[in-house]
């Protein structure tokens, strides 16, 4: 014989499960570092590499940036300050089509900035302020690096690296730019 409390509990559990399934999700992240907010057609926060302009293209979505606040390393900026390969956080809206949106904020902050300590051309790696940086064929290099590859850098060069941090702690570079010798140094990480 089933007690009323048990039956009510099962119905409540079933009801909650149906409601959760009906919501359809929309949040979460994927392996490429994409972080999404609410659902398509709603307010979103997305993080990813810039893949193009004509506004800003991130994670397959074309965000119109007219009127958006753009911030680079905590300083005001403009769309012309942004570069392909930089990992940015975008706050705004995505249209129902899932490929168009409007950004209200575009925020860039590098992963590490400082002098190159070592370069391993064979493994496409370098070390900046103790952080290992992995380069790939997808990494974009700035105009001041010639050739536009790891070979265009030397120990002692000051660089800015944008990318994603792997679970191993290695920075997977999406963009590397040479900076002036007097530029600031910056490193992010977990305090042990």
Regions found by a protein language model. Give the residues of each.
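Short, flexible, surface-exposed loop segments at domain boundaries
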Residues: 3-5, 11, 15, 20-67, ...
